[in-house]
Amino acid sequence: SAASDVYKRQHDCSGVLRRQLNWKEEHKSAVWTAIVRMKIKKQMEFLSELCCPQSELLKSYVDGTELNDRTNREGHAAKVYFDALFGLSFKRGDKTFLNGALNYGYTILLSAFNREIAGLGFNTQLGLAHKSEFNQFNLSCDLVEPFRVIVDKAVFGKDNCQFTPDFKRYLCDILNREIKIDDKYFVVNDAIGIYAKSVFNALEDGDTSKIKEYEF
């Protein structure tokens, strides 16, 4: 019956939430470190694709990322990466077309992660590294990090575009682009599900080799 279906869903969700609340701190640290490494690696791969020499520096950051990114390799990598992509005058946070386009694309990605994580029964507010009590989507903000490069690729070279409805549609369409994950091609929207489930599996026992990495 419909009532028993609702009850089962609620029961499943409470079971998932219990699992989430029981994740060990050392497992969360290991998984967050793996996510940071993957993010920097994707940035490195994009710069390498563009033949930017800075990709070598990012490679050293991947290798040098410590547990919980104690030495802030993520922050250092972001500076090098955005300078290489958009020039030394580019600053994240400035009110420019590029920043507006990046933010719009990132929001689309984050929404897809929110849907996936909530659909699996996890609480999006209980993050690994993002822990703001005012952010309902801390966990999504953690998991989305390596996927941001997909937006960066879509926005790169579009400096002369206008923020038209067509351009917004172009950015929305990133969820329908194909990427490779688990040795098969999937649209980004489906790849997010495969990746998110693999992260949650890794959080159960701290085995970060379970995390599935996508390729462009």
Q: Could you describe each region identified by the protein language model?
A:
Residues 2-7:
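Short, small-residue-biased leader/transition segments that mark boundaries at the very start
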Residues 23-97:
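Internal, conserved structured core segments that host functional sites
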Residues 101-126:
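Conserved mixed alpha/beta catalytic, RNA-binding, or beta-rich assembly cores of soluble enzyme
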Residues 130-139, 143:
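Small-residue-rich helix-loop
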Residues 141-160:
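A structural-propensity feature for long, helix-poor, extended segments
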Residues 158-216:
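Charge-biased C-terminal accessory regions appended to nucleic-acid-, cytoskeletal NTPase
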